Amino acid sequence: MKTLNVELIVTPKTPKKIRKGVKLLLSALKITDAKPVYLSFTHRSDTYLNSFCFKNCEDEKKKTGCEIIYGWSLWEDKKLGFYEAEFHSVIKDNGDLIDITPRRKNEDSILFVADMSKTSGRKSVNSWYSWSNCKIVNGHVAEVSVELEIVQADGELSEFHTAHAIAGKK
């Protein structure tokens, strides 16, 4: 028997509706008490970089005293039956959730759900504790989220391109 390896190009976008795939993500993440909300980007500083949500929120908290909220950006490629939850942080200012991290893909908004059971935090000068992405393909969990360390390799490039994950515990 021969094995056929197929590589699909997935182009996830912000879900327009909360469909079954998004609900499956929430279930896989064990989120039962929070509802996803759409958040637009709010510019707070020219120094905030795309994909550096942890650092951006940390810097904003130092400047304004706001609260950092951890959770998940939810993505879908509906045509391929692909759904993904990406660990993300936003701020809470005057009771409102605000996404201050510029977008990689210029999305108008993201679908965000808070997850009070997961946290992040600085481990060293250039690394944070975080969680890997959770992925669902055709209604089945393809990757579960695990705790990891994000290492900032270069301040000019996004975490997406410069980070590496090291499975481990705090």
PLM regions and their residue ranges:
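A structural boundary/capping signal
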Residues: 1-170
